[in-house]
Amino acid sequence: MRKKWAYWRRAVISLLCVISCLPWGQLPAAAEPDMPEVLEETWKQNDGLLVPANEPAQTDTPEVTDDEAEESLRGAGSLPSSYSLLDVDGSSYVTSVKDQGSTGLCWAYAALGSCESNIMKQGLDIPESWKDSSGELNFSEAALGWYPFTNHLLVGDLTSGDYITMDNKGISGGNPTIAGYGLAAGIGPQLEQFASMDDWSQGYSEYQRYNAYYRMQSSDLLQQVDTAGRTVIKQWLMESGAVSASFYSKGIFFDNGDSIAYYQKRHGTGDADHAVLLVGWDDNYSRENFQKSCQPKSDGAWLVRNSWGADDVGGGYFWLSYEEASLCEAARFQMTQDSTPVARYQYDGSVSYANVNFSAAANVFTAEKSGKLTEVMFPMTSNNSQGGWYTISVYRLKNNAQSPVDGTKLCSKQGTVQYGGYKNISLEAQNVMLQKGDRFSVVLELRKEKGSREKLWLSFESNSTETLERHCSIQSGQTFICSGDTWIDMVDVKQWQNSSGKKPYSNLGNAAIKAIVREQDTAVNWAQWNAAMSYGEPAADADPLYQAAYAEAAALSEDATQAEVDNAAANLFAGLEREGLIQYSQYIYA
């Protein structure tokens, strides 16, 4: 009996060894993979806003728990009773009131207003040539409303095939999530002078898809604004600048003689239909300032910049009660300015995801140039809005790697993340150096808290027709998920069948994990600029875009950054294309 037991024990051990070494996730037929639920990000359209489909349409003013009230009071202790970004020690950190006209681009005006404010609040450099005719920074809402909703088929772009289909594209509506995901993918912010709303009918050039005069480093999103959330928003306003937010706008904007006040309590967050910019607050703004037939219970209101033009009531500003029942989707956008060339490695060019709580996910990339991996980015879905604990690991893979962890671990970092939005984890101190041609992986795990086994939701692109028509592309060897202790190619996971014979993951695409690499070669490549400038100065009657782009390109100095050179060349290519002198994608790889 002992010999037989020893034989079977060796057989079982051998079988387990075989299973653990299966290449890139080939599971034996008898194995039951972990098949967690898929949560699609579903939205419904309320005028110019896309709001979560499961939000209640009717609600009373949210109840505040004792814990929330205590937390809010602790945070509020260090905050002033009033604050306005329009006047911080004599300086304004808000750009002028814009007019969205008849478009549904309120979400883009609010998001980019937050970006502009953050850049000003940080004191980032704003060259004179980047300012509009009124002398201020002015980003293109049209570009942000166009490219995420437009397919692009550029050979070599790993996000080709990732987009959303909507009638009239982003003019039909959007939200801060779409704005954040688009900016994270490198779609803007573009300058208004090179992608004017006036050009919407003829469209925008693919040459300009990735024109970005600054880079969005991260975003934070509060889906619901409770009492504790008010304190968070106030802190954001003081730390980072203006905050995008959404609310139901079909109530009465009451003119009390001194200001415009807005409050209603019949419609909840599910009815939110308009995005605006929070630029300040006043705890003592009297409840008596609101219309007598519908007044909040307490004093206090947000100072709001609208996007209905400076000729609108209040000069484009109004006060919104703290108790506004529909206030939601508060978002801030943190911007940065790169002085040296930066490469963004990504597969997720989409702006809409599905969420699955797999144990871990990984993306595998190939370094196009030598450089230092300085940042990893990933989204925290609204289902993870309470925050969580992340673990990021980076591997340099073997030539014959059989999984995304089959190689040398270059670093591992853990920590907490808060709120929804697109997160940015700095790996600057980890000194992760990559050589051209290196295959490397970025592995992401999300848990409820440190030491917890409770998994949080990981985000993946999705092909879905629910609410919106979403498109994504994926290839073998790009994204992997961990099921138990086995790494499996997402292309294979898409074929898994559950006990009902359905394929719950068939719509999934790549994992939303990005790697930011600061390139080692800092010499500026002027090849595209030279190619664009070779066509010479435009005629006096040439297209305005061509003229503006030529002026920008001609004004560059020898110490221009790679980003400045790339933006100028792309704008000039777009102008040449508009004139019929070239066709996309000519010169794109110059």
PLM segments and residue spans:
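Sec-dependent signal peptide cleavage junction
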Residues: 22-34
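Beta-rich interaction/scaffold domains
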Residues: 521-590
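Predominantly the structural core of cysteine protease catalytic domains
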Residues: 34-40, 45, 76-88, 108-116, ...
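Alpha-helical support elements that line or immediately flank enzyme active sites
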Residues: 100-125
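Aromatic- and Gly/Pro-enriched, solvent-exposed loop/edge beta-strand patches characteristic
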Residues: 385-475
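Bacterial N-terminal signal peptides
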Residues: 13-23
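Bacterial N-terminal signal peptides that target proteins for export
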Residues: 2-12
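Short, surface-exposed beta-strand/loop patches at domain edges
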Residues: 445-520
